[in-house]
UniProtKB/Swiss-Prot annotation:
Induction and repression of expression: By tobacco mosaic virus infection and by salicylic acid.
Annotated PANTHER family: GLYCINE-RICH PROTEIN (PTHR37389:SF28), NODULIN-24 (PTHR37389)
Entry keywords, A to Z: Cell wall, Cell wall biogenesis/degradation, Pathogenesis-related protein, Plant defense, Secreted, Signal
Species whose genome carries this gene: Nicotiana tabacum
Protein name, as recorded: Glycine-rich protein
GO biological process: cell wall organization; defense response
A Gene Ontology term for the protein's cellular component: extracellular region
KW Signal (keyword) present: yes
Organism taxonomic ancestry: Eukaryota, Viridiplantae, Streptophyta, Embryophyta, Tracheophyta
Length: 109
């Protein structure tokens, strides 16, 4: 009888920790915003590094020999320089490149 009680208690504790971790993760996801707006040039910066303009397997927008290096979920270190339908297709390689793309004049004649 004692082993059944310990098994039941262990299962109850496992369910408790599972539910509480889901609740904490949900609250953390609602309150945290990793993307912040850089005050200098208005580019979204998330503070994380990235492999800019490097093709590689396993990264969105990259691939063997193709370059790209865009990211679907994480964002880019210095902002996005080429946006596509599903998000960023190419990350900027330096901080001023995103601003250069914004200020380039393209005549519509």
């Amino acid at each position: 009888m004692g082993s059944k009680a310990f098994l039941f208690l262990g299962l109850c504790l496992a369910f408790f920790f599972l539910i509480s971790s889901e609740v904490v993760a949900g609250e953390l996801a609602e309150t945290s915003n990793p993307m912040k707006l850089d005050g200098e040039n208005g580019v979204d910066v998330d503070g994380r590094g990235g492999y800019n303009d490097v093709g590689g397997d396993g990264y969105y927008g990259g691939g063997r020999g193709r370059g790209g290096g865009g990211y679907k979920r994480r964002g880019c270190r210095y902002g996005c320089c080429r946006k596509g339908y599903n998000g960023c297709k190419r990350c900027c390689s330096y901080a001023g490149e995103a601003m250069d793309k914004v200020t380039e004049a393209q005549p519509h004649n």
